[in-house]
UniProtKB/Swiss-Prot annotation:
PROSITE patterns xref list: SSB (PS50935)
Organism of provenance: Neisseria meningitidis serogroup A / serotype 4A (strain DSM 15465 / Z2491)
Residue intervals of the SSB domain: 1-99
Gene that produces this protein: priB
Molecular function via GO: single-stranded DNA binding
Gene Ontology biological process terms in this record: DNA replication, synthesis of primer
Protein name: Replication restart protein PriB
Pfam families: SSB_1 (PF22657)
Length: 100
């Protein structure tokens, strides 16, 4: 069964945690993203505000480790936060500074 799991958001990098490395030497950067926008739902305007944990792997992790407070556009997919937690975490595959 092949369901789509694609997320695209304009967000603020609210918090950046210290970079870490897997045993294989792959950089891992965990961040908290903050989003706020007005969306239409059932014909009414609805204010959407959320924070979501996210993870960047590889070279991009090293590039973004000092970018707290920057607005970005991210694309990725939702996955479980850990083996023990089914809470969602955005796994970022593409990240670019948001130019508005």
């Amino acid at each position: 069964m092949g369901f789509n799991n694609l997320v695209s958001l304009a967000v603020l990098i609210e918090k950046v945690f210290p970079i870490r490395y897997t045993p294989a030497g792959i950089p891992v950067l965990d961040i908290i993203l903050k989003h706020e926008s007005w969306q239409e739902e059932n014909g009414q305007q609805c204010l959407v505000q959320l924070e979501i944990p996210a993870r960047i792997l590889g070279r991009q992790a090293e590039e973004w480790q000092y970018r707290q407070g920057v607005y970005v556009h991210v694309e990725g997919f939702l996955a479980q936060k850990s083996r023990r937690s089914l809470m969602p975490m955005l796994r970022i595959q593409n990240i670019q500074e948001y130019k508005g």
